[in-house]
Amino acid sequence: MKVDIHARRFKLTEALRHAVHREITRLVQGVGAGITRVSVRLFDVNGLRGGPDKGCLVHAQFTDGSSIVGSDVDDDLYRSVPVAFEKVLRSRRMDRARRHTLRRHHPGAWPNPA
């Protein structure tokens, strides 16, 4: 799995990098194998002016060809990171449940995941 973490308009600290890696571990444990790439963008829209403008955008790509994007903006980046990852995890679970239901009720309607 490839992991790509970038911070825009500020320096990526070791604590933030650790927080992102912790969430990547939770994501892998939550969806199992099948993640090929995770790109994380951390950003601060207003820079030093402050405000609820710090955000995290997560783009996860999977072996079945699908990809999911989750994002969150908050005044605290350490709160934004887990929320964005949780959105990706929740979307992946809903997608897998939807595919499972389609295969069960309409065999052949949805290609089997790789």
Q: Residues of each region from the PLM?
A:
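N-terminal, polar/charged subdomain of small-to-medium soluble alpha/beta proteins
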Residues: 1-114
